[in-house]
Amino acid sequence: MRLKQVTPWFCLRRIPELGGIWNPWSGGAYRNACMQNSRYTFHYTGFPPGDIDEFPGVEQVFRYLSAVAGEDALRESTRLNTEVVSLRKDAGHWVIRCASEGKDTEDIFDRVIIATGELWQPRRPPLPGEENFSGTLITSRDYQEPEAFKGKNILIIGGGVSGADIASDLVPFARSVSLSVKKMGLYLPRQFPTGPNDMMHSYLGRCLLSQMNYEDFIGYLDTMMPDYMQAYRASGLLPDMANNNAVHVNEKIIPNVAAGLIKVKPLAERFTGEGAIKFVDASQEKYDVIITCTGYEMPDYSFIQGFDRTQLYEHFFWTEDPSLAVINPPVDTAGFGAAFPYFDIISQWVMNVFSGKTSLPEKEAMRKWCAEHMASLHVKRFYDSWLETIRIGLLSGLLPEPARDFSRYWNIISSIVKPAYLATPPAFPEHGMMDSLFDFRIARIRILSGLGNDALGYLLKKGDITDAEYRAALEIDPRQSISVHLPYSQTSL
């Protein structure tokens, strides 16, 4: 064991290369996976991707992340093949014990960020009688390429995006593909007739979409994508009710089911004595391969001495000692939206807190937030990463304050979700292709109405709003106001 002096900063990684699950050799994303977000929206705020496919695949995302690391000279300060064994606070400093190549070392730091990710330890659904199954039983984490399953009868368990992706990936090679689901959410394609799915709405458009009647939304989709929606109804999978914002992105699963290429089965219950799967409707079938796609376990923080995950303010700052931050997805959320710009703005917030540029609330206020929001970590909820980016950007002071700089704030939220606009608001709003569904003029007044009389007076004097907008905002029923944070439904149906 050797003890090092305090160092400026290091990045410690367990695997031998950068890129996380997008590293083709990490065993993370399977070979044919591609981004659910387009090249226009998926990237970090200050690092556009250049000339890549509209929806980049594993190799392209890996090259992009490698370029980001090279740009920031991250490689020189990164220790690969290094496992963090323990983390403890001692004499005002964080002591990190690591293991690498058979050696243990300790390093001392003033501040620590945990960014381990969540897509590493897959959940396995309980299937009694597994010992009777003589075929191949793997998880989505083990799946890499469809050719290995040529000519097999395959059952996929799980109705999420991974299940839909892998089932569709297998169709050209397997003898048969079945998909066992408890329920399925709303599946829409990456590409709409008018452009990429994620270019359809601005941030404000997404907020208003959350409030839209589901039947009206489906009616609009019928008009926009009649062939797709006809196949959706033929598949029998169109939900009777869904969260409009909680979209599952996959353009193959619905046409494949409608064409009979994927057979939908109810929830798998157990194995029979003969090794067949018995479903909850009492039907039974035998399979050569079963692939479970039922999510991932919560990240394991047991290596942090004295840590309590329920005391993470806003899911990121440890209330008992905010010199420790966790930049991982909030646990048990069904997220939708671009992860990179979302984590980008959280990272900026963390660094501003660490540097003293930004302050967090008092400890008691943070504990109160945790008591209200972190008590039920296993309750599944929808998490709109785009709208959370706006909320966190305002909370952290990284986006223009609406009460003082409404014009720049408005130009961000009423524009499509391009990451560059978070750093430099456009001179004029760039609306999404489906924003015409909503009356932004009225929405603007509803947002202004929640700012209060003093802020409205200031904005009028500054010239950010007109006299007509000022008067209209004063007349709005407070119950009709829209928060500047752009709230949305977190119900996961």
Predicted regions and their residues:
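Feature captures the FAD/FMN-dependent oxidoreductase FAD-binding
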Residues: E54-Q121, N256-V257, R270-G275
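N-terminal glycine-rich dinucleotide-binding loop that anchors FAD/FMN and/or NAD(P) in oxidoreductases
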Residues: S26-G50, N197-M212
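Rossmann-like dinucleotide-binding core of oxidoreductases
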Residues: M1-W22, S66, K103-D107, V112-H248, ...
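Helix-loop-beta segment of a Rossmann-like dinucleotide-binding subdomain
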Residues: H43-G57, V95, K150, R233-N244
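C-terminal, flexible cofactor-proximal segment of oxidoreductases
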Residues: L186-P189, A325-L493
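FAD-binding beta-loop-beta segment adjacent to the flavin cofactor pocket
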Residues: P24-N37, L127-E131, V280, Y296-V326, ...
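FAD-site-proximal beta/loop scaffold in flavoenzymes
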Residues: T136, S140-E145, G275-F279, E285-Y287, ...
